[in-house]
Amino acid sequence: FVPDPTYSRSGLFGYGIAFIFLTTHLIFRWVDSGHFPLSNLYESLLFLAWCLVFLQIYLEHFMKTLFLGVFTSPALLCLIAFTDLSLPEELQKSEPLVPALQSNWLVMHVTVMIASYAALLLGCLLSIVYLIFSQVFNSEKEKKNLELTSRIREETKVIVKNNKINDDSITEPTFRKVGPTAVLSQKFENTSFFTMLDNLSYRTIGIGFCFLTLGILSGAIWANETWGNYWSWDPKETWALITWLTFATYLHSRLIAGWTGSKPAWIGSFGFIIVWICYLGVNLIGQGLHSYGFFQV
């Protein structure tokens, strides 16, 4: 999988333009409202998109993962389209912060949590892509191997017929060497793309897990200052813990159990759903200390 450098540079340039526009938009909302723009769902989704674009630019520019935009661009497009086109206008307006959010911990806690969601979602998306491509790869590989085996057998029969020898004299090593088409199978043994995809998913999820841990700890300190206790089993807190345990399991499977490939990718794919439940699903309930009105964070 070798992307065209011209297309890759064009894509990176497009991401740079998107990053500038998102940054400008967030700054204008910050100046207009007088506080960091994280008071409702619209602003949090904008910041999530900003974090995803930043991660995309970082990974492509510094880690030379030129293929990443092929998978992340559609997801980002859907996210921004949902943010701007689906949410009601009243939810897109800047609002004054409720008393519970009027704290310096807002920037420390909420930004870190959303940054963790961005990294985790990106890593999980790569896990999903890994599973899809590996399935396609294995199916294509099996098909090609069957075709290759059939062609080799046909060539072997021709050799046997032309040389008037018995089939028993054709040994297994001879069978493997017969026919120039055998080299075709080597093309399907190159798994460097899958290794890169697997490692990139692992590293991105690891970054997201670190941010998630910091976000939970900072949230606990803020909760103690605001409500008098570090943990209250609020729905948001509970699902944040579930999210943390899910990705702790993922990292444990990689670091301790030594899993690679499809096994941890399945955990990452499951984590994709868990993150969205923690980020959006809990707010749909409209209950708990983290609910400050309909669709607000």
Where would I find each of the regions flagged by the language model?
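Hydrophobic cores of alpha-helical transmembrane segments in multi-pass integral membrane proteins
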Residues: F1-S94, L101, W105-Q135, N145-K187, ...
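Acidic, metal/ion-handling microdomains and their immediate structural contexts
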Residues: N138
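Extended substrate/cofactor- or partner-recognition/assembly subdomains adjacent to catalytic sites
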Residues: K141
